[in-house]
Amino acid sequence: MAKSSFKQEHDLEKRRAEAARIREKYPDRIPVIVEKAEKSDIPTIDKKKYLVPADLTVGQFVYVIRKRIKLSAEKAIFIFVDNVLPPAGALMSSVYEEKKDDDGFLYVTYSGENTFGFGSP
């Protein structure tokens, strides 16, 4: 998978400092970077940085992403952390502890496909 554009735009020290500041100020929240998969035809999300409640499940977070990109009901959405599809029932805090980047952010990539096999007219 290509290097995150967030990582390309901000150097490691700046990202580390920002993640540490966020975790200190909001200890019950997870700093998450959300980016669309390169070859996906799903809409692009309007913002990349999210502060997610630690007790939110992956499934609930997927719902948040779906709302932000205004995804129609017949479209599926899949999120990947480190190229792996996390379980929908997993807490974001446990995914964060297992998969957070060296800079302190959790990087989530989303992608979609049409689950019913037909496109827009």
Swiss-Prot record:
Membrane topology term reads: Lipid-anchor
Tissue-level expression reads: Constitutively expressed.
Q: Which SUPFAM superfamilies match?
A: Ubiquitin-like
Modifications the protein undergoes after translation, according to the UniProt entry: The C-terminal 4 residues are removed by ATG4 to expose Gly-117 at the C-terminus. This Gly-117 forms then a thioester bond with the 'Cys-558' of ATG7 (E1-like activating enzyme) before being transferred to the 'Cys-258' of ATG3 (the specific E2 conjugating enzyme), in order to be finally amidated with phosphatidylethanolamine. This lipid modification anchors ATG8 to autophagosomes.
Q: Which GO terms describe its biological process?
A: autophagy; protein transport
Keywords annotated in UniProt? Autophagy, Cytoplasm, Cytoplasmic vesicle, Cytoskeleton, Lipoprotein, Membrane, Microtubule, Protein transport, Transport, Ubl conjugation pathway, Vacuole
Note the site residues: Cleavage.
G117, F118
Enumerate the InterPro entries for this protein: Atg8-like, Ubiquitin-like_domsf
Q: Where is the lipid attached (Phosphatidylethanolamine amidated glycine)?
A: G117
* Propeptide regions on this chain: 118-121
Family membership noted in the UniProt record = Belongs to the ATG8 family.
Assembly, in brief, is: Interacts with ATG4. Interacts with NBR1. Interacts with ATI1 and ATI2. Interacts with SH3P2.
State the name under which the record lists this protein: Autophagy-related protein 8f
Annotated source species: Arabidopsis thaliana
Its encoding gene is what? ATG8F
